[in-house]
């Protein structure tokens, strides 16, 4: 099957001809997400190409950082590492493959289908933090390791994935060691959004956007101390209680 292009107002999708209808739905999702993101971020990411890959091998070959990120991610969240947001391109599995990767638990399919919006959200967050990827240079990846919980968590919250994360969080708590606070890069894809979910409950959406946008010149710990107006120890206790409720 050949590749074709499907345009929308601010995106162009490249995809297998079999995926034309799905590409149109992805573009609709992205245009709606972009409207919301532009209301919250001052960054301009310009026109973006969306590449819908028809196999995992194709995605990994096009974006070598993706298989590495998958290996660095906790097992409970690896199925959700399905793309990468570059400077001018978003690479993601096509919807039929996203659906195939979903588990039988509630919320898995919904999280995967929101992956394009999550990747676009990640691009907007990254644009507000110019020292983070993209591009995926060694120095930027090293900085991302410290800030992964913010980048991935903000993308999850902004795209709506946090509404569907409960079963995956429960699996992570059952199968893995006690998570770090803030979540390490291994847990960022899955647990980063729970920090934003807790912040939204306590301080409102505006506080979440402020945390996502930055800047945070004094580092991740100080960023959390500013976002949650109390000691870091009390915030960690509240977060672990929040995780416990999600894992029930």
Task: Pin down the residues of each PLM region.
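Acidic/histidine-rich, surface-exposed loop or edge segments in extracytoplasmic proteins
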Residues: 4-22, 96-101
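Soluble non-cytosolic domains of exported or imported proteins
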Residues: 17-32, 106-111, 115, 145, ...
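Zn2+-dependent metallopeptidase catalytic core
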Residues: 18-72, 106, 113, 124
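Sec/Tat-exported extracytoplasmic proteins
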Residues: 34-41, 116-120, 124-132, 158-163, ...
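Surface-exposed patches in mature extracellular/periplasmic domains of secreted proteins
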Residues: 37-53, 127, 131-137, 168-170, ...
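Secretory-pathway/luminal and periplasmic proteins that interact with or process carbohydrate-rich
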Residues: 57-63, 164-165, 218-223
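Zinc-dependent metallopeptidase catalytic helix centered on the HExxH motif
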Residues: 75-165
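Pan-zinc metallopeptidase signature
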Residues: 178-248
């Amino acid at each position: 099957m050949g590749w074709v292009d499907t345009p929308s107002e601010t995106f162009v999708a490249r995809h297998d001809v079999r995926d034309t209808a799905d590409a149109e739905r992805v573009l609709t999702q992205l245009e709606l997400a972009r409207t919301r993101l532009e209301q919250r971020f001052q960054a301009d990411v310009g026109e973006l190409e969306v590449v819908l890959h028809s196999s995992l091998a194709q995605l990994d070959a096009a974006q070598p950082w993706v298989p590495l990120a998958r290996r660095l991610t906790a097992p409970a969240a690896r199925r959700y590492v399905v793309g990468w947001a570059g400077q001018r391109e978003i690479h993601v599995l096509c919807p039929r493959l996203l659906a195939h990767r979903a588990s039988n638990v509630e919320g898995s399919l919904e999280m995967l289908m929101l992956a394009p919006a999550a990747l676009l959200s990640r691009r907007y967050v990254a644009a507000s933090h110019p020292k983070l990827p993209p591009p995926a240079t060694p120095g930027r990846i090293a900085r991302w390791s410290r800030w992964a919980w913010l980048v991935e968590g903000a993308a999850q919250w902004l795209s709506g994935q946090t509404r569907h994360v409960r079963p995956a969080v429960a699996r992570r708590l059952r199968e893995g060691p006690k998570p770090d606070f803030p979540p390490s890069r291994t847990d960022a894809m899955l647990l980063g959004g729970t920090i934003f979910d807790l912040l939204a409950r306590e301080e409102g959406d505006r506080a979440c956007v402020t945390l996502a946008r930055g800047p945070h010149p004094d580092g991740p710990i100080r960023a959390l101390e500013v976002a949650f107006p109390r000691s870091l120890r009390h915030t960690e206790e509240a977060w672990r209680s929040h995780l416990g409720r999600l894992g029930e």
